[in-house]
Amino acid sequence: IGFGTSALRGAKNGELFVKEVYENIGIRIHIISGSQEAQLIYRGVRWLFDFKQAATIMDIGGGSTEFIAANARGIVEAQSFDIGVSRLYQNLNKRNNLTANDFKFIKIHIFI
């Protein structure tokens, strides 16, 4: 079993990809929502760390970033944003060093 996250959620051919993988390799992929992704991230972190007080978990991926506010009892709030490292890089369309304008672009996309 596999899980598809932001790249497959946003792909025009995501369902076709899932079908092709299953037919050719035999692996069933489930495309999960950003909310489900945040839940799984929390479970993974919780499995590794037994935090007794409030915690903020951040997962920066290629196509999305999840923020999870949690405490010892569970998730208090979770948000998934379509801002990931690969997505920002593609929007910048750069192969060399970033300029001051590139950093402005990144700030606008992250903070607005």
How would you name each of these model-derived features?
Residues 1-57, 68-112:
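Nucleotide/phosphate-binding catalytic cleft detector across ATP-hydrolyzing
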Residues 64:
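Active-site-adjacent helix-turn-beta-strand microarchitecture at beta-sheet edges
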